[in-house]
């Protein structure tokens, strides 16, 4: 009986996470609809405000209005707050306010916090939450300070706001920029393709935000003693390194051939880092080769790591599936890595998440392509960007109809709350202590 009660508590915590994100999105949309949220002082249509709020809370970066020219200072501030809440997580922010007010965190709340940041255990969760919040603000502050000289040199005193906004947006893997003007909309960071300070700072912020809070904790606790890290941290760091270096080498030889060597290296690295849920771009994406776009779609679907500011199906999901395939080839019963066996339930979970993300990506792309009369490849790029909470686009987002925008809203939301979180929140728990059905083999492959 206690086991069932515990499961119900876990289920309610997943529902709280799902509903918490939805509540913040709706509230953000209502505020963005207000006339003083836009520079023109007009009421923003609800579907556009909802799209922007969803993109901010789900740290995606897809927009239907240029953030720099359409939204007022107030509107941009609201978007920044939504990005910060979405990056940290609704539950983490709620826990922060509870701790600041001196309230005691109950066991149920600790369990919810555990699920929200993918922590392995409830013990020490309050300490970990404090560590996450302090680390987040410190890293964002450092990123802001490093970018200050460049932005203040270009924009004067306004450069302080520019540096702060882009530091938070990069660390939270959001991809929102406020560099657009009425004459030059949706520029992202194309004007800084050869600027080492901006490129390197943004890339580091994206990577640190995307490797996960538990990996931070591991690194801070064990320093550079890689062997002492948790198995999950090792898998995350190795997978992340591979997913950065391999595509960067490909992009270097297949794209950006007209750039000087230094800019070509920066552009290749940047476009390798940013598809994994960040959404900034320094290059003109539509001009990249078809094979490069296909690689970027795969990177967008993978996304960041568990318990991070990033979305997507996660680096660990990809790693577990590949390791499981290797174990089959080697005729082993269990997948193995770093001298450890991977739990069979993790393999099943990884398969479920991968199938769910692929179906959302593919079905969404087909529907949008049919509704808009656009090439399927272009629409699949858009849906991969949405479900992976990336924010990269080939330029079609602002021109999409209401139906297609609503599809992207749903994909962004599902991509941020996470596949397993959504499944656990939606599917009721069943008592599995009864008799099992007869076992029968089925041929695959």
Predicted regions located by residue number:
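Membrane-proximal intracellular helices of multi-pass ion channels
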Residues: 1-445
């Amino acid at each position: 009986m206690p086991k069932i009660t515990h499961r119900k508590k876990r289920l309610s915590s997943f529902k709280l996470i799902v509903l918490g994100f939805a509540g913040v999105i709706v509230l953000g949309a209502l505020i963005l609809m207000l006339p003083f949220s836009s520079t023109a002082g007009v009421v923003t249509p609800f579907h556009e405000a909802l799209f922007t709020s969803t993109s901010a809370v789900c740290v995606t970066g897809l927009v239907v209005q240029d953030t720099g020219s359409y939204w007022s200072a107030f509107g941009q501030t609201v978007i920044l707050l939504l990005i910060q809440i979405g990056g940290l997580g609704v539950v983490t922010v709620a826990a922060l306010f509870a701790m600041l007010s001196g309230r005691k965190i109950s066991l149920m709340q600790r369990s919810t916090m555990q699920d929200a940041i993918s922590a392995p255990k409830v013990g020490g969760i309050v300490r970990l939450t404090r560590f996450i919040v302090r680390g987040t603000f410190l890293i964002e502050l450092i990123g802001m300070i490093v970018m200050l000289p460049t932005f203040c040199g270009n924009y004067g005193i306004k450069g302080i706001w520019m540096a702060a906004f882009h530091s938070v947006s990069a660390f939270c893997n959001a991809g929102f920029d406020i560099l657009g003007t009425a004459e030059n909309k949706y520029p992202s960071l194309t004007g800084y393709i050869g600027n080492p300070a901006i490129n390197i700072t943004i890339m580091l912020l994206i990577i640190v935000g995307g490797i996960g809070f538990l990996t931070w904790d591991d690194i801070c606790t064990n320093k550079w003693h890689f062997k002492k890290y948790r198995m999950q941290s090792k898998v995350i760091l190795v997978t992340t390194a591979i997913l950065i270096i391999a595509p960067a080498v490909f992009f270097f030889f297949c794209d950006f051939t007209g750039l000087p060597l230094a800019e070509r290296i920066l552009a290749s690295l940047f476009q390798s880092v940013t598809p994994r849920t960040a959404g900034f771009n320094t290059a003109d994406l539509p001009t990249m080769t078809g094979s490069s776009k296909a690689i970027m779609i795969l990177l967008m679907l993978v996304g960041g790591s568990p318990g991070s500011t990033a979305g997507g199906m996660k680096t660990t999901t990809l790693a577990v599936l590949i390791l499981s395939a290797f174990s089959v080839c080697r005729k082993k019963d269990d997948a193995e890595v770093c001298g450890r066996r991977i739990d069979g339930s993790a393999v099943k979970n990884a398969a479920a998440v991968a199938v769910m993300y692929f179906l959302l990506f593919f079905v969404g792309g087909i529907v949008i392509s049919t509704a808009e009369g656009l090439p399927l490849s272009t629409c699949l790029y858009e849906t991969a960007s949405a479900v992976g909470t990336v924010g990269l686009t080939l330029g079609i987002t602002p021109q999409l109809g209401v139906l297609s925008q609503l599809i992207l809203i749903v994909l962004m939301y599902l991509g941020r709350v996470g596949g397993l979180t959504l499944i656990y929140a939606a599917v009721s728990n069943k008592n599995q202590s009864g008799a099992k059905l007869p076992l029968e083999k089925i041929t695959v492959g």
